[in-house]
A protein has these predicted regions:
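Phosphate/NTP-binding elements of NTP-utilizing enzymes
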Residues: 1-173
């Protein structure tokens, strides 16, 4: 899914909730949920929001273990952590859910491509790209935005539209 929305409309909260739901309720053994961004501080915003949700919920606190490195669901050997393109150890990841934040700031596709490659072993992987329109857009955002716009046009049979049932683009302008 691709979700573009203006600032301060709850992107991080939405992503965090989806990540926690998939961590605990989807039944995926060894689930790896990653909040990713260009830099670690940005990736940690979604993850930290999830940590706050766990701390505020007695039900989640009883099921999950939080550390400085991640949120763990031991019953399913599942993990929710933050990663960034500046991280050196991205190979070997087996993500079930990838929460890609603020793609307007991304310069290249390397991190996203590595996550998508890692998802190939999963039966029902989820990639959620969220972003504001940003200040200086780079290649990744423009490519995703253009493709999403064409898919939306395809759903409503407009000229220039394409049909791709593997993504759900949502653009609020």
């Amino acid at each position: 899914a691709i979700f573009f929305v203006a600032k301060k409309n709850g992107k991080s909260t939405l992503s965090s909730g989806i990540g926690l739901y998939c961590l605990t309720s989807d039944g995926e053994g060894g689930a790896e949920i990653y909040s990713i961004a260009k830099v670690k501080d940005q990736a940690k915003i979604v993850w930290q929001e999830a940590v706050h949700m766990v701390k505020k919920s007695p039900a989640l606190r009883a099921r999950l273990r939080t550390t400085i490195n991640g949120i763990f669901y031991d019953r399913n050997d599942a993990l929710f952590a933050a990663l960034a393109s500046e991280t050196n150890s991205l190979d070997g990841k087996n993500p079930f859910v990838v929460l890609a934040d603020e793609i307007w700031a991304w310069v290249g596709m390397n991190l996203l491509n590595m996550m998508e490659d890692g998802m190939s072993a999963r039966e029902q992987p989820i990639l959620l790209e969220t972003s504001t329109m940003g200040d200086v857009r780079e290649k990744v955002f423009d490519n995703e935005y253009d493709y999403s716009s064409k898919v939306i046009k395809g759903y409503i049979n407009e000229p220039g539209g394409i049909v791709d049932e593997t993504i759900l683009p949502i653009i609020y302008e």
